[in-house]
């Protein structure tokens, strides 16, 4: 099976009913579709609510746009001084090397900006301008490679970018955001791992994983190839209705990540991307999940539940608040993971 990209191919392989092909063609004409073999093989065609299918198989509900939906929900454009750069926070920038992915998630917050009709990679001139911008901004401590998926690029291309960034003295950390270990595990070759690991500058890889079934033996092996060379691995997970918003699924996912040497980093509240409302939950649901996870799983398994404030105002943590109140004398009332309240005395002066 090759990567599935059209409604006809999805019908042929049993992921879309023939009577729905026409409406799905409308969706695929609006938003990019790519379902690689590694993920298509995980889908249970007999389960109409399969969590893998909900992430990657297009749905007519994507044509429903809500008043709150935004083409650029996290405000990338507001903070883009040059093509390819998003400079939202003082000490770090995003470097968007490509607008192409191995798989297109149905909830993607950059769905208006990515796809096969977009440039595969920044042109040499635009990349040079982006590197120049980083070089001339001494407050930039970390560069985050994103896109699209930067690991869709060749090891040669990645090696060149990493070398250029590593040569900038004030850049101390390089981070890569990717779906590739689960979307196409065989692409994580020894050559690619060597390309992204540079001397004297730590490289972190944040792997996007939303459901424990994505951590196949092949995906685990791909992650191990990076971890075995000393590359620290983090995870990014999006809270998604009907996919991972069940306590047992979230717990299983976080435990599986830690077992794979991947530290859970962010649990993202769904962004206001067009046509994704059916996959978003409310904030209270996410807080309940985090509260339950706190009581049942190791601290290693705890991600930070965050929301990207629309308009480009950055991430804010929105997890449950265990400090429920303060008394008149400044003593605190703290709630434990069971919901029981306890008094913590004020500091005596």
Please place each PLM-identified region on the residue numbering.
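Domain-level signature for proteins that mediate thiol-based redox and metal-cofactor handling
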Residues: 84, 118-119, 135-137
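Conserved, mostly hydrophobic/aromatic
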Residues: 39, 105, 265
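C-terminal accessory regions of radical SAM enzymes
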Residues: 288-349
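Conserved catalytic-core segments centered on acid/base and nucleophilic motifs
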Residues: 95-96, 108, 143-145, 150-151
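Flexible, acidic/Gly-rich N-terminal and inter-domain linker regions that tether
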Residues: 1-87
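Canonical Radical SAM [4Fe-4S] cluster-binding loop centered on the CxxxCxxC motif
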Residues: 87-124, 176
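Conserved AdoMet/S-adenosylmethionine-binding subsite of the radical SAM
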Residues: 127-142, 151-297
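Short, charged beta->alpha transition segments
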Residues: 80-83, 93-96, 128-133
């Amino acid at each position: 099976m090759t990567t599935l990209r059209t409604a006809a191919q999805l019908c042929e392989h049993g992921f879309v009913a023939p009577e729905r092909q026409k409406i799905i063609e409308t969706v695929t004409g609006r938003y990019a579709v790519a379902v690689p073999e590694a993920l298509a093989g995980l889908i249970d065609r007999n389960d109409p609510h399969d969590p893998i299918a909900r992430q990657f198989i297009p749905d007519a509900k994507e044509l429903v746009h809500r008043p709150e939906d935004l083409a650029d929900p996290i405000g990338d454009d507001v903070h883009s001084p040059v093509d390819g750069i998003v400079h939202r926070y003082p000490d770090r920038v995003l470097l968007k090397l490509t607008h192409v992915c191995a798989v297109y998630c149905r909830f993607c917050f950059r769905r208006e900006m990515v796809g096969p009709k977009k440039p595969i990679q920044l042109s040499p001139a635009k990349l040079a301008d982006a590197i120049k911008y980083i070089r001339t901004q001494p407050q930039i401590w970390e560069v985050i490679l994103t896109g699209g998926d930067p690991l869709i690029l060749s090891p040669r291309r990645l090696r060149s970018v990493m070398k250029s960034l590593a040569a900038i003295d004030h850049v101390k950390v390089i981070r890569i955001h990717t779906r590739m270990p689960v979307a196409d595990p065989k692409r994580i070759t020894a050559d690619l791992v060597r390309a992204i690991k540079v001397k004297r500058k730590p490289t972190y890889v944040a792997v996007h994983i939303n459901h424990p079934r994505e951590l196949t033996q092949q995906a685990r092996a791909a992650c191990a190839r990076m971890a075995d060379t000393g590359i620290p691995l983090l995870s990014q997970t999006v809270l998604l209705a009907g996919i991972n918003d069940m306590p047992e699924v979230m717990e299983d996912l976080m435990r599986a990540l830690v077992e794979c040497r991947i530290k859970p980093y962010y649990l993202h509240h769904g962004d206001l991307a067009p046509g994704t409302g059916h996959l978003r939950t409310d904030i209270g649901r996410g807080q309940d999940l985090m509260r339950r996870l706190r009581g049942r799983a190791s601290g290693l398994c705890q991600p930070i539940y965050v929301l990207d404030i629309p308009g480009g105002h950055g991430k804010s943590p929105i997890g449950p608040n265990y400090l429920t109140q303060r008394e008149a004398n400044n003593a605190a009332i703290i709630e434990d993971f069971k919901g029981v309240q306890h008094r913590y005395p004020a500091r005596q002066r």
